[in-house]
Structure formats: structure tokens, C-alpha cells
Design a protein with these regions (language model features):
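Membrane-interfacial amphipathic/re-entrant helices at transmembrane-helix boundaries
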Residues: 1-53, 88-102, 174-177, 223, ...
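Hydrophobic alpha-helical transmembrane segments
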Residues: 12-17, 42, 71-75, 101-109, ...
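Hydrophobic core segments of alpha-helical transmembrane domains in multi-pass membrane transport
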Residues: 15-28, 56, 81, 111, ...
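Single transmembrane alpha-helix segments in multi-pass membrane proteins
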Residues: 24-92, 113, 120-127, 267, ...
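Transmembrane helix-bundle core of multi-pass membrane transporters
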Residues: 4, 101, 130-201, 228-231, ...
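Transmembrane alpha-helical segments in multi-pass inner-membrane proteins
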Residues: 234, 240, 250-290
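Alpha-helical transmembrane segments within multi-pass membrane transporters and channels
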Residues: 89-137, 289-290
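Helix-loop-helix "hairpin" substructures at the membrane interface of multi-pass membrane proteins
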Residues: 99-107, 114-118, 122, 176-254, ...
Length: 290
């Protein structure tokens, strides 16, 4: 007998069957599709979006959504590079000469801080998540434009910026049939493993499903809903900052429009992967496929 739970599992992960069909289609369409170099490039290009989709999945499962992801990505990367690159006429930097690894911590913290502020406005200010995150998207993008004066950020050739280049370009090892696997792909895989464990085997994940499924019932069960919402936006901001680190290192440039229009692809990836816009449903495995 086909149980209801098994049917839901198949529906949530239907994307993987579709991916197999698309994969087979392109194999017959082009002799170059299955080359190691092409597969490696596809995986590397998808790594940034994969991290953003993971963060958005947490938010969607809780019954909320985050439109500020793409702007958070850009500002966090901008802050990280500004802290380590010397100030000068040909470089963009604050002249702080911060330790590169410490600058990465600051960059990730910036993402988490933005998420926390958004969460506080939603919970303490009793404001709708659409209004707050849309405003954050526009305000942060404006700050980036003012900070950079609309010019591309240079300075990636500085040795201190190698930590950005490492995550965006460095190849970890070679896998037969898949080519050289980049550090970004490995980082994305690790993110999904950790996020899957949190959703399925941790109290935090179970409470998110409860909040997204029925907020009133979750509150009646004693779940601190507002605190979880703040935490979920912090997590989304943190993962957006990680995505910014990856993207900046891959394109070796930061512009005021870094990550622009990503939000549409991120939402599409999560929803196609079986994550409900109504909340309370979705898996990391499905989101990864999306």
C-alpha cells in the first residue's frame, strides 16, 4: 500500500526525477554537456544560489519570506572587502588592514545583524514581513550605491583579498566524471547537510514546521514564535552573507548591483523544490534539487 506520508515524500522530491529527465535530454542535445569541465562549471555556478535557497527555505517553512536576501548578499561582501583592502586612489578600502579571516567573520556577522534587525521590526514592531523585507532590499541597495558611488570595487588583486578568491575559485579535488570540485561546491554541500540535520533532527526545525503550519497552535504549545522568527531571519542573513563571499570571489568584483534579481531565482528554486509559500512544508533535499 502507498502510504500518505510516502506520497508526500514523492511530491516534495519530484524535482529530482525532473532533473534526471532534463539531464538526459541535454546529454543527447550536446556532446559537450557531459564533459568534466561543463559539469564542474554548472556546480560552481549553482553553489551561490544553493546557499541562498537554503536560507530562504528556513524562512518559508516558518510561514514568512525574505525579499532582502540579494541586498544582504551584496552589502556583506562589500563590508568584508572594505575592511581588508588598503585605502588609495586605485583601490576601494577603509585602510583598516584587518586580518582577512576576521573580516570574513565581520562580513558574516553583518548578514546576521541585518537579519536580526529585520526580525525585530517584524516581531517587536508588528510589521508585515513583505513591507519590512522589501524596504530592507531597497535601503541596503541604496547604501551600496552611495558607498561605492556606483563604481565597481577594485582591490581583489591585493594579497589580503585572497580569502575571497579562495572560496570563489579554488578547486578542492577532482572527481572522475564531475571534474574539479570547487571549495564553493563543498561549502554548499556542507551547508545543506547541516541545515537538513537542523530541520529534521533538532528542536529548532520542528518548531519552525509547527509555526508555519499553524502559528496559533504553536503559541498554544508554548513555542516562543517571535524569538524563532528573529532567529530564522538571522540565519537567512548569515547564509546570504556566505553567498556574497562566494559570489564576490567568483566574479572577482563587487558592484552596487551585486546579486540583483537573485531573489526571483531563489524563490523559484525553493518553491520548485517543494517548499510551500504558505509555510509548514518543505525539505532541504527538495530545496537543493530546486
Amino acid at each position: 500500500m502507498f502510504s500518505y506520508n510516502r506520497l508526500l515524500f514523492l511530491i516534495d522530491h519530484l524535482i529530482w526525477g525532473i532533473l534526471v529527465l532534463v539531464f538526459v535530454f541535454f546529454i543527447f542535445q550536446s556532446e559537450y554537456f557531459l564533459t568534466e569541465r561543463n559539469i564542474s562549471n554548472i556546480l560552481t555556478a549553482a553553489a551561490v544560489l544553493g546557499v541562498l535557497v537554503a536560507g530562504q527555505t528556513f524562512v518559508l517553512i516558518s510561514g514568512n519570506f525574505d525579499l532582502s536576501t540579494e541586498s544582504t548578499l551584496g552589502l556583506a561582501a562589500l563590508v568584508g572587502i572594505w575592511l581588508i583592502v588598503p585605502a588609495g586612489p586605485t583601490t576601494f578600502g577603509g585602510g583598516i588592514y584587518m586580518n582577512p579571516y576576521l573580516s570574513i567573520i565581520c562580513s558574516l556577522s553583518m548578514g546576521a545583524l541585518i537579519g536580526y534587525i529585520i526580525g525585530c521590526l517584524i516581531t517587536y514592531g508588528n510589521m508585515h514581513n513583505f513591507i519590512v523585507t522589501l524596504a530592507a532590499l531597497l535601503v541596503i541597495r541604496g547604501l551600496m550605491m552611495a558607498f561605492t558611488e556606483g563604481a565597481p570595487v577594485s582591490g581583489f588583486n591585493n594579497p589580503s583579498a585572497d580569502v575571497f578568491y579562495w572560496l570563489g575559485h579554488e578547486k578542492a579535488f577532482k572527481v572522475p566524471g564531475l571534474g574539479k570540485i570547487s571549495v564553493a561546491v563543498l561549502a554548499t554541500g556542507l551547508v545543506y547537510i547541516v541545515c537538513h540535520l537542523i530541520l529534521k533532527h533538532h528542536k529548532f526545525g520542528r518548531e519552525l514546521y509547527a509555526i508555519g503550519g499553524n502559528r496559533d497552535a504553536a503559541e498554544a504549545l508554548g513555542i516562543n514564535v517571535n524569538r524563532r522568527i528573529r532567529q530564522v531571519y538571522m540565519l537567512s542573513g548569515l547564509l546570504a552573507a556566505l553567498g556574497g563571499w562566494m559570489l564576490a570571489g567568483r566574479v572577482v568584483s563587487i558592484q552596487s548591483n551585486l546579486g540583483e534579481t537573485f531573489i526571483f531565482t531563489v524563490f523559484a528554486g525553493a518553491v520548485i523544490g517543494g517548499v510551500s509559500l504558505q509555510g509548514g512544508r518543505g525539505t532541504m533535499l527538495g530545496a537543493l534539487g530546486g
